[in-house]
Amino acid sequence: MNIRPLHDRVVVRRKEEETTTASGIVLPGSAKEKPTQGEVLAVGTGRIQSNGDVQALAVKVGDTVLFGQYSGQTVKIEGDELLIMKEDEIYGIVEA
Protein backbone atom coordinates (compact mmCIF):
# COMPACT_ATOMS: atom_id res chain seq x y z
CA MET A 1 0.00 0.00 0.00
CA ASN A 2 1.32 3.39 -0.95
CA ILE A 3 -0.69 6.33 0.37
CA ARG A 4 0.55 9.71 1.57
CA PRO A 5 -1.99 11.72 3.58
CA LEU A 6 -1.92 15.50 3.27
CA HIS A 7 -1.28 18.06 6.02
CA ASP A 8 -2.61 16.93 9.43
CA ARG A 9 -4.32 13.76 8.22
CA VAL A 10 -3.45 10.26 9.42
CA VAL A 11 -4.14 6.82 7.88
CA VAL A 12 -5.18 4.22 10.47
CA ARG A 13 -6.01 0.49 10.26
CA ARG A 14 -8.57 -0.54 12.89
CA LYS A 15 -7.45 -3.28 15.28
CA GLU A 16 -10.10 -5.99 15.28
CA GLU A 17 -11.44 -6.78 18.73
CA GLU A 18 -12.42 -10.15 20.14
CA THR A 19 -15.63 -11.62 18.77
CA THR A 20 -16.29 -13.58 21.97
CA THR A 21 -17.63 -11.96 25.15
CA ALA A 22 -16.10 -12.56 28.59
CA SER A 23 -18.81 -15.15 29.29
CA GLY A 24 -17.94 -17.06 26.10
CA ILE A 25 -20.75 -15.85 23.82
CA VAL A 26 -19.67 -15.52 20.19
CA LEU A 27 -20.91 -12.27 18.64
CA PRO A 28 -22.06 -12.21 15.01
CA GLY A 29 -20.55 -9.54 12.76
CA SER A 30 -23.62 -7.31 12.96
CA ALA A 31 -23.57 -7.25 16.78
CA LYS A 32 -19.96 -6.13 17.08
CA GLU A 33 -19.11 -2.49 17.69
CA LYS A 34 -16.50 -0.85 15.52
CA PRO A 35 -13.06 -1.02 17.16
CA THR A 36 -11.83 2.28 18.58
CA GLN A 37 -8.13 1.43 18.46
CA GLY A 38 -5.89 1.24 15.46
CA GLU A 39 -2.37 1.30 14.09
CA VAL A 40 -1.08 4.40 12.32
CA LEU A 41 0.08 3.45 8.81
CA ALA A 42 0.94 6.89 7.41
CA VAL A 43 1.00 10.53 8.56
CA GLY A 44 0.88 13.84 6.73
CA THR A 45 3.55 16.53 6.84
CA GLY A 46 1.84 18.47 9.63
CA ARG A 47 -0.70 21.14 10.52
CA ILE A 48 -0.26 24.49 8.76
CA GLN A 49 -0.34 27.32 11.31
CA SER A 50 -1.88 30.76 10.66
CA ASN A 51 1.62 32.24 10.17
CA GLY A 52 2.44 29.62 7.51
CA ASP A 53 4.69 27.44 9.68
CA VAL A 54 4.11 23.68 9.68
CA GLN A 55 3.62 22.03 13.07
CA ALA A 56 4.72 18.38 13.06
CA LEU A 57 2.18 15.77 14.15
CA ALA A 58 2.40 14.09 17.56
CA VAL A 59 1.57 10.64 16.15
CA LYS A 60 3.98 8.59 14.06
CA VAL A 61 3.81 5.48 11.90
CA GLY A 62 3.45 2.37 14.07
CA ASP A 63 1.68 4.11 16.98
CA THR A 64 -1.45 2.49 18.41
CA VAL A 65 -4.06 5.22 18.81
CA LEU A 66 -7.51 5.64 20.37
CA PHE A 67 -10.30 7.40 18.48
CA GLY A 68 -14.08 7.75 18.42
CA GLN A 69 -16.29 5.02 17.01
CA TYR A 70 -17.38 7.24 14.12
CA SER A 71 -14.12 9.18 13.60
CA GLY A 72 -12.55 9.59 10.20
CA GLN A 73 -13.58 8.54 6.73
CA THR A 74 -13.50 4.84 5.81
CA VAL A 75 -11.77 4.04 2.50
CA LYS A 76 -10.85 0.79 0.76
CA ILE A 77 -7.35 0.62 -0.66
CA GLU A 78 -6.05 -2.58 -2.25
CA GLY A 79 -8.72 -4.57 -0.39
CA ASP A 80 -7.84 -3.10 3.03
CA GLU A 81 -10.44 -1.05 4.91
CA LEU A 82 -8.63 1.97 6.34
CA LEU A 83 -9.56 5.20 8.10
CA ILE A 84 -8.33 8.64 7.10
CA MET A 85 -8.76 11.16 9.90
CA LYS A 86 -7.39 14.45 11.13
CA GLU A 87 -4.97 14.25 14.03
CA ASP A 88 -7.41 16.14 16.28
CA GLU A 89 -9.88 13.21 15.96
CA ILE A 90 -7.35 11.02 17.80
CA TYR A 91 -7.92 10.91 21.56
CA GLY A 92 -4.56 9.49 22.57
CA ILE A 93 -1.62 7.18 21.93
CA VAL A 94 -1.46 3.79 23.68
CA GLU A 95 1.97 3.37 25.24
CA ALA A 96 3.24 -0.14 25.91
UniProtKB/Swiss-Prot annotation:
Gene3D superfamilies on file: GroES chaperonin
Family of the protein in this entry: Belongs to the GroES chaperonin family.
Pfam family, one: Cpn10
Assembly and binders: Heptamer of 7 subunits arranged in a ring. Interacts with the chaperonin GroEL.
Gene Ontology biological-process entries: chaperone cofactor-dependent protein refolding
CC per GO annotation: cytoplasm
Gene behind the chain: groES
Protein name listed in UniProt: Co-chaperonin GroES
Upper classification of the organism: Bacteria, Pseudomonadati, Pseudomonadota, Gammaproteobacteria, Oceanospirillales
